[in-house]
């Protein structure tokens, strides 16, 4: 059952990203490295205020939906009520999501799809190297230790 739940959680993650870039990859310019963002703004593909507004309009609902889904999966679907049980489940989900984001989203989808290539920036290096992915995912792995404690606390309080 946990594998099905992890798959659902990762598909929800993907769906949220896909919705954010409806109309083209430029709508998700905030996902790109700063140098690519700056160059896209110079080319007039988007302005910085619009990009920042789109980032905020994505990130706030994204975090709310992903947090709510995680709390409901752990507390309601799995019936976890103790902090410890909820913490370990949250840590598993967050770490799997972290790896999924780095490998499936960043390396496979972004790295092998023409969708993410911006007009006028065809030669811009926007796909992370394996070294960059490992560094970012290692840092996030530590952050998710604390994030799992927050989720565990919420589940314990609600359920």
Label each region the model flagged.
Residues 1-92, 96-159:
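Juxtamembrane/disordered regions of integral membrane proteins
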């Amino acid at each position: 059952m946990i594998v099905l739940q992890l798959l659902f959680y990762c598909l929800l993650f993907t769906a949220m990203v896909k919705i954010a870039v409806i109309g083209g990859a430029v709508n998700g310019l905030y996902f790109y490295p700063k140098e690519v963002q700056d160059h896209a703004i110079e080319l007039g593909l988007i302005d910085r205020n619009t990009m920042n507004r789109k980032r905020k309009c994505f990130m706030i609902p994204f975090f709310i939906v992903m947090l709510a889904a995680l709390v409901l999966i752990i507390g309601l679907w799995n019936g976890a009520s103790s902090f410890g049980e909820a913490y370990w489940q949250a840590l598993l989900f967050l770490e799997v999501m972290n790896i999924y984001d780095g490998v499936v989203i960043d390396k496979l989808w972004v790295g092998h799809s023409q969708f993410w290539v911006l007009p006028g920036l065809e030669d811009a290096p926007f796909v992370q190297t394996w070294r960059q992915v490992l560094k970012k995912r290692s840092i996030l792995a530590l952050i998710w230790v604390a994030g799992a404690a927050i989720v565990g606390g919420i589940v314990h309080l609600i359920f």
